[in-house]
Amino acid sequence: DGLKLNYLRISEAKLTGIPKDLPETLNELHLDHNKIQAIELEDLLRYSKLYRLGLGHNQIRMIENGSLSFLPTLRELHLDNNKLSRVPAGLPDLKLLQVVYLHSNNITKVGVNDFCPVGFGVKRAYYNGISLFNN
């Protein structure tokens, strides 16, 4: 089958968006310390095998609704040190998500349904860590 890339980190490269042409075999993608301002719907489409996504230290203000739904196996999401004003939509639907870094953003309000699914009997993994300090 040849080689397949599992881990990729592109840091301090002045990226303004998530590259759409990286290998879809990636399990870990770290794009920290760039200039990414938004996550749009199709940005994560090909990265369905990711279990760790690092987007800390960017300028992300907006995460389009539904864009995280392409990451069904995601366990860790690093969105610290950005410019988010609210918790991204769709976190409760990521059933394996355990760690969410949202510290050092501009989040002023956290809703009761921002992290947990609505309704009884909906199964998901327990969170090991959610960071919201310095908002």
UniProtKB/Swiss-Prot annotation:
Major localisation: secreted
Keywords from the UniProt entry: Extracellular matrix, Glycoprotein, Leucine-rich repeat, Proteoglycan, Repeat, Secreted
GO cellular component assignments: extracellular space
Glycoprotein among keywords: yes
Tissues expressing this chain: Found in several connective tissues, especially in articular cartilages.
LRR repeat residue numbers: 4-24, 25-46, 49-72, 73-95, 96-117
Subcellular localization: Secreted, Extracellular space, Extracellular matrix
Modification after translation (UniProt): The two attached glycosaminoglycan chains can be either chondroitin sulfate or dermatan sulfate.
Organism name: Oryctolagus cuniculus (Rabbit)
The protein's name in its UniProt record: Biglycan
Function: May be involved in collagen fiber assembly.
Family of the protein in this entry: Belongs to the small leucine-rich proteoglycan (SLRP) family. SLRP class I subfamily.
Gene designation per UniProt: BGN
Pfam family of the protein (one): LRR_8
